[in-house]
């Protein structure tokens, strides 16, 4: 074969760019909203424009592209909409850091418009990199429909949705205790707060009762908030304090008199049984304050410093204020003690700041009216969640859903479309262009709300905005909405998935997608090195790479699977992996790992393993090309003579049909790992290691007729075309490259359609590309009765020969001489002999009536068929040992099955077919044991 036409090694770099350009140039990614084909649509979870793609992006987009390519080949009008997310807090934070590092300036050094120009510039650069990387991965998105969560269409949709909810009274504005990030100076939703267990202190502080010499002691983790105390609470059932309920105490430093109240929410066993109530800075205290109509005093500035309500502590940070207050309490004799105490602390998922419960006026979405529909979509299976274990998580979250804080004190994002009157409480919600008519007439009296919407508000509308809503006449909306499936990580089931269901169903009264597949989160291997003091640090750089490649770990280094993190040194860059192993190897690795668990352990050796498979695919195809190069498409159009098909041919066709059936089932439930494994095993084991090895003597002219050889070649071409189709959704680059080589080799398809064996391959060859070819279908032939059983016997005969070779330590390169004894299955043995020779490394196999008396041989029995391997004289002792082992195994098996069959409970309750199978198994084992005993006796 010409090296230029078909190089010995596959080079991803030399083909991937050209193949992708061919697809894109040919318009194969573009969806047609006017098509009569059934629709299949996906909207890409938009990557944040904060940087570049990470391995999680590579995973989710590989899985989506696999589905899109599969459905495209099945004849659906597929539409995969790509896009990026403005990611309000995240992007603003990144840009602020960039400006600080590059220009030495803060956000507040710019006007709002100037700062936003910097953010838009950042967005353009980041988005271009992200989209380029998606192309490298092989994503077959419809780039003509590319969207951004702050593009004009998205902005129209966001304003429209806000006004719809505002007019319904679902959106409201009010004072509420929010999660405040003092670094980013914005409110966060409850699910944007991460909780960490942290060690701290429990402080005991005394408050003097007014007009009394008595004191009441409380325990608190946050003594600085006493400046905002408005009550002391005790349990009404706590006899220690019942006489004090209704009395008042004095708050130190601010000299405010506050009541002692009785409240059943107080845990009398915690601390002293008395707790301070600071409604403006604690969520539980807020509820108590509302129930008792207590004042709510905010003591903090937006930056986390003590405000004017803090008296002498005004201007201090929370941390410094705490220290000064404790010192001052000690001086006044009001500090009792402190105890070590561990508590859950809320931390901002973006800035890492300790979250401050903060009384603030914010915009909210009331969720009560949505709760039933959110449950109903999933309970009725209008939305199916995969894996189903997450249904419970979803429903639990919906049941505990609280009003959603949607305002953010940021500059980057969708500005809230509400105008406030400067002179009264009037507000106008407006969803049109420009501003409301009242504002245009008297602009000096109005101002637009300065806050922006939570990123998840616009992301919640993503499936709608991608297809043109709120334009109800949009062809895309009519054709492609609702979408088929949402593929995303399980970690944003609450952040995003539920909010999409809420927002989209509120706008158009239907679910945004039919299915949700929640993949696991990627974990990488990190290495902790411990020093003599027991302290540890993460290993990085060359040493880590050596460990990843299998270098033995020292005793003081421990490997651990952890979420990918730069600080842990276990980040795996998908683009680096593509450069090193090729996009197909990366995609296959990710698919093979995408099980239905919550964690995906991603190891470097997997990329190496699947790169080897890509090379195996190339080399296997190259071998086949060497034997079909003289074929033309016309040969395939003529079909094959099924009378010339052998057992091995029927076997491989049956295995292929079974593969299609299994893979289709796994696509339906998003078992990507099983799809990858099945396709991998079929090509590597069934096609290459089994079928090709069996037919090599025919291909090389060592056995069978010219007509049989021609039939095998047609079948090989047919199988290769079809398996390329099966593999294409996962490994599109190499399959497209090989498909184009097949088209060039076999030539233009004429008018013939082929037969039931070659017909679909002929149909695929008519396609411009593998990507748009029809997905393979089962190959229909008259399969012989008992095919699987017959080939199974052939495989077991081969296994027996290989087992004898191994146990006798015979040279694996030395062809063996074997014989077979079977009075009942001579025809089957005749069919099995070529398979035994090809796969068992046997030179000759004779059918005998009895074992040769003048030879030393090792004997095995398969389904009553005795198979023997002639041995050199020196192997007599080894054969006796082998037979004794086999005798022991069979005796144990016979004893176990006999006991089972002796059980009346088993015989009466078990399926009759299972009982019969056990009887047959017992009979075969007894026959095999007798053969072993006879052989031992002869030795």
UniProtKB/Swiss-Prot annotation:
Any one Gene Ontology BP term: valyl-tRNA aminoacylation
Q: Where is this motif: 'HIGH' region?
A: 47-57
Task: Say if the entry is tagged with keyword Ligase.
Answer: yes
Q: Specify one Pfam family.
A: Val_tRNA-synt_C
Positions that bind ATP: 566
Listed A to Z, the keywords are: Aminoacyl-tRNA synthetase, ATP-binding, Coiled coil, Cytoplasm, Ligase, Nucleotide-binding, Protein biosynthesis
An annotated Gene Ontology molecular function:
aminoacyl-tRNA deacylase activity
Gene Ontology CC, one term: cytosol
Recorded coiled-coil stretches: 874-939
Q: What class of enzyme is it?
A: ligase
UniProt xrefs under InterPro entries: aa-tRNA-synth_I_CS (IPR001412), aa-tRNA-synth_Ia (IPR002300), Anticodon_Ia_Val (IPR033705), M/V/L/I-tRNA-synth_anticd-bd (IPR013155), Rossmann-like_a/b/a_fold (IPR014729), tRNA-bd_arm (IPR010978), tRNAsynth_Ia_anticodon-bd (IPR009080), Val-tRNA_synth_C_sf (IPR037118)
Q: Which domain of life is it from?
A: Bacteria
Q: What is known of its domains?
A: ValRS has two distinct active sites: one for aminoacylation and one for editing. The misactivated threonine is translocated from the active site to the editing site.
The job of this chain, per UniProt, is described as: Catalyzes the attachment of valine to tRNA(Val). As ValRS can inadvertently accommodate and process structurally similar amino acids such as threonine, to avoid such errors, it has a 'posttransfer' editing activity that hydrolyzes mischarged Thr-tRNA(Val) in a tRNA-dependent manner.
- According to UniProt, the name of this protein is Valine--tRNA ligase
Q: Which organism is it from?
A: Chlamydia trachomatis serovar D (strain ATCC VR-885 / DSM 19411 / UW-3/Cx)
